[in-house]
Amino acid sequence: MMSSAEIQGLAQRFADAFGNKDVEAVVGMLAEDVEVFDHVPYRFDDKAQFAGYLSGAVGAFTSMSFAFRQPSCRMLDDAVGIVNAYDSFAGVTKDGKVQVLHGRTTLVFGKRGGEWKIVSAHFSPLPQAS
């Protein structure tokens, strides 16, 4: 059975790949039928849809970083693991604008064909302080 520490390692691999603009590695971690809720007002219903969006979004930045804070990782059974965390994103766009976002992430990992894949992902911004 996979341990919560191993699931946390997979989540870290995801964060590192995203922060390094390695879209291929991020997409490689997704199940074909992944569902993703991101910072846009619609849902992605499969890997191909999200890959197209992600490629365009990452391509808008010359540099970026991404990290998880306070990850909570747990196994539901021998085929499902969940990671909840706060996330921090910083990037510089091609026109030199700095973007900093703080949010929440939930990644659900499922065993698919002997491999752990992200089967569901939810990214949402933290409320702005008033």
Where would I find each of the regions flagged by the language model?
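Short, cysteine-centered beta-strand-loop-beta hairpins and adjacent loop/turn segments enriched
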Residues: 60, 89-99, 127
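A solvent-exposed, acidic/Ser-Thr-rich amphipathic alpha-helical stretch
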Residues: 4-5, 23-79, 100
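Short helix-adjacent coil turns
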Residues: 14, 21-22
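Basic/polar N-terminal segments that are highly enriched at the extreme N-terminus
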Residues: 1-5, 129-130
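Short beta-strand edge/turn micro-motifs at domain boundaries
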Residues: 102-129
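A short hydrophobic beta-strand element
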Residues: 79-89
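Short structured motifs
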Residues: 11, 66-72, 86, 104
